[in-house]
A protein has these predicted regions:
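Long, highly charged amphipathic alpha-helices
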Residues: 72, 92, 167-171
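Alpha-helix boundary/capping residues
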Residues: 77-80, 97-100, 211, 296, ...
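Exposed acidic/Ser/Thr-rich ligand/metal-binding surfaces
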Residues: 111-328, 382-389
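An acidic, Ser/Thr-enriched
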Residues: 21-22, 26-87, 105-114, 119-127, ...
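Extracytoplasmic
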Residues: 82-99
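Juxtamembrane/interface motifs at transmembrane-helix termini
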Residues: 94, 204, 331-332
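Sec-dependent signal peptide cleavage junction
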Residues: 1-30
Length: 399
């Protein structure tokens, strides 16, 4: 049995270009003020094809709670442009919205439903598979040591970048839990420590007010200082998190992705995780920001407006900080007697082999308190199965 969905003989086959894992600037777009987006980087992850169940009954993927793709698209539209095609990641659009799954006592609850497909083809249905992590609330969140790494390079000298970052940090300061500690590192041409870890809210606010842009972008140096601070202040049993606020540009130092990503991954294995918050449009590196979060066992968000920050930081940022499941995976096993073929909508960069589901060494996704993961499948039900309303479509497992 082939585990490669692209080998399904009856499946829709995308063109080779759709599988190209290329990284390139998006098209030159005209904004209302005639400033182009010609240095905004996205990656093409292809499109999942249909898979025949006679070839593979398992669909496996890593859970993903990133939502940056949706808010980036919203920013494109706000500026009067259509979103770059490669910026659209279907699962991040779906997971941005509350699916209204009910709470249960377990760490995770599974929700499955479906309906006839709206695309009009006979025997095609849309299947929704949802997973919800238990919400711990403000009081239930562990206390946290948070080191913010703020890009203050010249590329951040815009209203929607550094000034937005500062407003976000002020907002977080108002929502800290007793026992939380915050440190602040900045980087431009070089990295600097602005404030060591402290629980004094006024000191935190004062440090934020001193942020000013200037210089080139030595992201690696800034992260290096942040990890040193986080390591010194590491406390077992607490949340130890680096939060990077940047437009993703890195142009000084050993800034090839491998150098930065390997450092991030090494510290994630020690319990110091990384979340990335993206700001700005034009000269924005979506690819790097997502890769950093993935390597750091964290999540990636794009802040296009202050209300988006309020959504993330509400209730003491429990969903942002408190991890309920690490390397979390979903596996759907389809019943080949009922389902002829299926197609997972989105999660192209989270696909796993069937055997990876039980392999704890395989990196997957992290899910925070109260967060939901939703996957949509387009499935074709066999003709004879239509006459058997008691047949089951399949089973859902999480790990």
């Amino acid at each position: 049995m082939s585990s490669d969905p692209r080998q399904a003989p009856y499946s829709y086959q995308p063109s080779p270009a759709q599988y190209a894992r290329e990284e390139r600037p998006g098209p030159r777009l005209s904004t209302p003020n005639n400033r182009p987006y010609d240095t905004t980087f996205f990656r093409n992850y292809g499109v999942n094809p249909f898979v025949a169940t006679e070839d593979e009954v398992y669909s496996t993927f890593g859970m993903d709670v990133d939502t940056a793709s949706y808010t980036i698209a919203r920013r494109f539209l706000q500026d009067g442009n259509m979103p770059d095609r490669e910026s659209v990641r279907t699962e991040e659009f779906i997971n941005y919205f509350d699916q209204d799954y009910y709470d249960m006592q377990d760490l995770f609850s599974i929700h499955v439903d479906g309906a006839l497909s709206e695309f009009g083809r006979p025997n095609y249905h849309l299947l929704r598979v949802g997973v919800k992590a238990r919400d711990v609330g403000f009081d239930g969140r562990k206390t946290a040591n948070m080191v913010f790494v703020v890009d203050v390079s010249g590329s951040m000298d815009r209203e929607d970048r550094l000034e937005m970052v500062k407003r976000n940090l002020y907002l977080l300061g108002e929502n800290l839990k007793e026992g939380d500690r915050v440190g602040l590192v900045v980087y431009g041409s070089e990295g600097r420590i602005i404030s060591d870890l402290t629980s004094d809210k006024q000191s935190i606010m004062d440090a934020v007010s001193r942020l000013h842009p200037g210089g080139s972008t030595n992201a690696e140096e800034g992260l290096k200082l942040a990890y040193k601070m986080a390591s010194r202040g590491f406390e077992e049993g607490k949340i130890n998190r680096i939060i990077l606020c940047s437009d993703g540009v890195a142009n000084v130092g050993r800034t090839g992705p491998k150098s930065i990503l390997s450092r991030v991954k090494k510290f994630a294995e020690k319990g110091i995780t990384l979340t990335t918050l993206g700001f700005g449009m034009g000269n924005y590196n979506d690819v790097l920001m997502e890769q950093l979060a993935n390597s750091g066992d964290g999540s990636y968000y794009y802040i296009d407006r202050l209300s988006e920050a309020e959504r993330l930081f509400k209730n003491g940022a429990g969903a942002l900080l408190q991890v309920i499941g690490s390397d979390a995976k979903v596996q759907v096993e389809f019943n080949p007697d009922i389902v002829d073929r299926y197609r997972l909508l989105g999660y192209e960069n989270r696909r796993l082999e069937a055997d990876d589901f039980m392999d704890d060494s395989v990196d997957a996704g992290e899910v925070g308190a109260g967060q939901t993961v939703t996957a949509l499948y387009e499935i074709r039900v066999k003709d004879q199965a239509i006459q058997n309303p008691n047949g089951f479509i399949g089973q859902v497992r999480i790990r």
